[in-house]
Structures are given as structure tokens and as C-alpha cells.
Amino acid sequence: MSILGIVVEYNPFHNGHLFHLKKAKELINPDLTIAVMSGNFVQRGEPAIMDNYSRAEIALKAGIDIVVQLPVVYSVQDAGGFALGSVWTLSLLGVTDIVFGSETGNMKLLDVLSDILIEEPTVYVKLLKQHLKTGLSFPNARKAALKDYLKLHLSDFAESIQEIERSNNILGLEYLRAIKQIRSDITPHSIVRTGADYNDPYFKGRFSSATAIRKLIITGQWEKVKQAVPDYSYAIIKRECALKKCPVHLEKMGRFILGLLRRLDREDFKNYYGFTEGLDARFVRCSRQCGEISEFLECVKAKRFTFTRLKRLLMNVILKLSPKLIEQSNKQGPQYIRVLGFNENGRSHLSRIKKKLKVPLLTTPSTWKRVMYKAISGDFEIDQDLFQLQMKRDIMAADIYSLFFDDVKVIKASNEMKRRIIYIRG
């Protein structure tokens, strides 16, 4: 059986995503398509523009058979942790092929680079340290070290060096690395992205970036939004915004975040993943000097810290993501598979494989404790403590996210534990 897996955020689902999905299906001709999707907080260190269930509903209407949620312990990590959690989840579900978008179709180059990252040759490590000493951020230092290593030791790829630069190529590289790291049988494929660059903030018509579309939603430019997304995506975006559940964005969270930070002293930051190189002192000082989150980020920013890294650190504080929890999750993998929605084809598949899975399926959040205890007494390969921590962080993420809806009544009614799975019939 051919099962296509894709890693998505759909923040929000737009015409470029639809193009990728169609091309992926044409390439694999799968019997089933599964998407692992970030929940309410995404990899760029921000809240999603809409909640997890509304984005899953759009994905199902686009033709995906099963949508599962990537636990938040992975969704707000850097490219490596994000890819690891995503690939691990898809592997647990029996996915045979993964297709990702990149700015290059050069799978041979990505394969070579992923080997370098896994094996970490002495020369590469030395080059990386040299670039870090110049004050470059880790992602930029790593790109520079990889480019230098290729020039020195793999001259056949010298002409392809510039392809390393683009963000989607780095993410594709991490998918390959994750597949090798967990020794998965998944076969990776890449298709060239189309349309605007991932971070392009400007409206470019039908193929605008998610960044540009989010700005249009926030500013209420609905005619332009309509051009950039499929009709079913537009209808659900409009519905969620009419319900005052959209848009959610980082600026809305600003005072909440600054309030949390102002309660902390430098030593408190050791409890949160990723705080190194004096960042604790910067966070303490800037949180007390600034009144908006954009101002805070500018205050903390330095050459070696990207804005995205700083925003992820904020998420680690908000969601109480400790070094131990992240390291343990990256070592042991997801402890459950949380299903957000399926169609008839997806439902049938889950019924067939449910008893063969190594981790339990979770379809109703309110039953998670019952599912966990049943799993422990059964044949599942899970860690009870890690299961609880991963699940509690997902629920916490949803509870915090709902605070930023624009209607108090909606906030009160938004209980993640009561959410029902989305089932698209027919």
C-alpha cells in the first residue's frame, strides 16, 4: 500500500499549498495521504492565524485523508526538531513516501548534506566553530560551514553550493536527516516550490506567501485574500474570523508575554529550553524596558540570534518547555498520535492499523488519561511520564491560544478537551 506523508502548517492553506499537494499526489499516486500538521503554535515561533481544527478541516477539504497534530514540543523547535517529530509521526503511521517542497529538486545534494550533518566530520565541525566565532547565528554558521566543506571535499557539488541558502532547502535537508536518524523506511521526494518566497511579505496575486496572506487577514483585505487561497479555505477563514477566533498573532500576545517575562529572574531561564550565550540577561532587561513584543525582539536581537530563534524561545517560556522535556522527546519520539480529522478513506485506514501501532491513537482529547493507562497495560512502546508531559503541553498550548480570541464568550466556550474529531463524509 502506498501512503503519502506531508508535513504542513497551512497557516493558512493557500494556492501554493494546493499546488504542492496536487504535485505530490501526481508523483506518488498514493492509496492514502496523511498530513502531520502543527497545532496552535508553529515553527516560526508564533501562534497560528487560526486554530488547529479549522486548519485541519481545510486540509481535509483539499483532499488529505488523515490530519494528525504534531505535538507542540516539536512544532516550536528549530528545523531539526520540527523535522524529527514530523518524520517520526509519519513513520509511526506507516507512511511509505514523504514529499516536501524546496527551492531545488536536487535530492542528491540534500542526501550528501544530510550525511555530513549526521556523521559530523572533524573538518566540518572545525569549520562550524570558526564561523560561530565570527558572530554568525547557528543556522548561518552551519550553512557557511557546509558550503566550505563542499568546496574542500566534494567538489562535484561546488556548483550547487548556493542552493543551501534557502529556508525550504534547509528544512528538506532536515527531513532526510531525520529519516536516517530514526532509521525509517520512508522514501523522500522533493518538488520545486512555486510562487512567492516563503517569507515574502508582499501580495503577489494567486501565489502569495503565507506571510503575506496573514498580513492581509490581519488588516482585513479580504478581496486579496480571496485571490490567494482556494474557495473552501477562504470560506473557513471568513467563518472563523466572523466567530472572533481569527486572526491570532504574536502582537496580540505581547503584554501577556511581557507580563510572564517580568516575573522571571535570570536563574529562572535555565528551566526553559534554548537559553544560552547570555540570552537570559537580555530577556530580563528588555522585558522591563519594552511595551510591545516587536520592540522587545528588536531590543534582544543581536547578530548571532535570528528573530525566529528569539520567538521560539518566547514559546518555550510560555509553554514551559524545559531542556529535559525537549531532549527526551527528541530521543524517544512522539508518545501518541493525535488525530484531528479524517475522511472515509482515512477512517477505514485507521481502523485497520490501530492495533498494529507502537503508540496509541488519540481522537478525543478528554480521554487522553484513559488512553494512556490502557496503552501502558497493553503492547505499546510508550513512556508514561513523557506521554503526560507531551499531552499536557498540547492542552496548555490550546488553552493559552484561546485567550487571544476577540470575544470573551468564545474564549469561555473554547475548551480543547471538548473538541470533536472532524469527519468529512463522502
UniProtKB/Swiss-Prot annotation:
Q: State where ATP binds.
A: 7-20, 101, 168, 193
Q: List, in alphabetical order, the GO biological process terms annotated in this UniProt record.
A: tRNA modification
> Carries keyword Glycoprotein?
no
Describe the function of this protein: Catalyzes the formation of N(4)-acetylcytidine (ac(4)C) at the wobble position of elongator tRNA(Met), using acetate and ATP as substrates. First activates an acetate ion to form acetyladenylate (Ac-AMP) and then transfers the acetyl group to tRNA to form ac(4)C34.
Cellular component terms, GO, for this chain's entry? Answer: cytoplasm
One family name in Pfam for this protein: HIGH_NTase1
The protein's name is tRNA(Met) cytidine acetate ligase
Please write the reaction equations for the catalytic activity of this protein: cytidine(34) in elongator tRNA(Met) + acetate + ATP = N(4)-acetylcytidine(34) in elongator tRNA(Met) + AMP + diphosphate
* Chief site of localization: cytoplasm
Q: What keywords are assigned to this protein? A: ATP-binding, Cytoplasm, Ligase, Nucleotide-binding, RNA-binding, tRNA processing, tRNA-binding
Q: What class of enzyme is it?
A: ligase
Asked if the Swiss-Prot or TrEMBL record annotates the protein with the keyword Ligase, the reply is: yes
Q: Which InterPro entries match?
A: Rossmann-like_a/b/a_fold (IPR014729), tRNA(Met)_cyd_acetate_ligase (IPR008513)
Q: Which GO terms describe its molecular function?
A: ATP binding; ligase activity, forming carbon-nitrogen bonds; tRNA binding
Family stated for the protein in its record: Belongs to the TmcAL family.
E.C. designation(s): 6.3.4.-
> PANTHER family from the entry?
TRNA(MET) CYTIDINE ACETATE LIGASE
The record, for NCBIfam families, names:
PRK13670.1 (NF010191)
**HAMAP family registered for this protein in UniProt:** TmcAL
